């Protein structure tokens, strides 16, 4: 029986140092409406999300449409790059992708973040066999999850993601069978 997980990278957010509470921008809310419109066509059964506000706000229209509460899952929160803002994000993110076991002080290595994301993903798969499930999340953790099932999804793929973006991962049991990009702004 096929299970479909729709991973939704959050829409554009207004920068604040508060990672958990950072809201969507005006443009982000517009794109979140497009996310809802696209996913209305997919017969969604449940909606899960990272607890970060921007991820929740991106998928809350889908939850309202299907009249279900969003279930918050810590495992889908963004990977922690470092305990403090890094001087050069590009250098910092490149290093963790080149060495899966490297982590900056107070941050998560790719391997640790991936393990967290996969644990959450497998729990969702096990409790939603044969269903269509939306997961509001973040770019880095989303690609780490995809990479676990197919290593073609790596750093270069992450760099090409849009904000927001939607990927439908189809599973038979715990085996990923297909990946389709759903996001289309037009």
List PLM regions with ranges.
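Acidic, low-complexity terminal tails and accessory targeting/binding regions
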Residues: 2, 38-42, 68-72, 78-90, ...
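Generic beta-sheet signal
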Residues: 5, 131-140
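Short active-site segment of divalent metal-dependent hydrolases/proteases
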Residues: 13, 141-142
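Phosphate-handling substructures
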Residues: 23, 64-118, 159
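Short beta-strand scaffold positions
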Residues: 49-50, 115, 136-137
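Active-site signature of alpha/beta-hydrolase-fold catalytic machinery across serine-
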Residues: 61, 144-148
């Amino acid at each position: 029986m096929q299970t479909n997980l729709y991973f939704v990278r959050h829409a554009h957010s207004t920068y604040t140092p508060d990672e958990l509470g950072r809201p969507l921008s005006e443009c982000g809310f517009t794109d979140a409406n497009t996310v809802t419109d696209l996913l209305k066509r997919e017969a969604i059964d449940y909606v899960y999300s990272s607890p970060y506000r921007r991820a929740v706000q991106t998928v809350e229209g889908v939850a309202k449409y299907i009249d279900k509460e969003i279930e918050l899952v810590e495992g889908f929160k963004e990977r922690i790059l470092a305990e403090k803002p890094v001087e050069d994000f590009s250098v910092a993110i490149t290093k963790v992708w080149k060495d899966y076991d490297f982590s900056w002080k107070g941050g998560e290595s790719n391997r640790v973040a991936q393990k967290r994301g996969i644990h959450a993903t497998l729990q969702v798969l096990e409790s939603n066999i044969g269903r269509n499930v939306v997961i509001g999340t973040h770019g880095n953790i989303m690609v780490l999850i995809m990479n676990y099932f197919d290593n073609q999804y790596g750093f270069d793929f992450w760099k090409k993601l849009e904000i927001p973006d939607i990927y439908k991962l189809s599973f038979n049991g715990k085996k990923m069978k297909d990946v389709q990009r759903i996001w289309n702004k037009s």
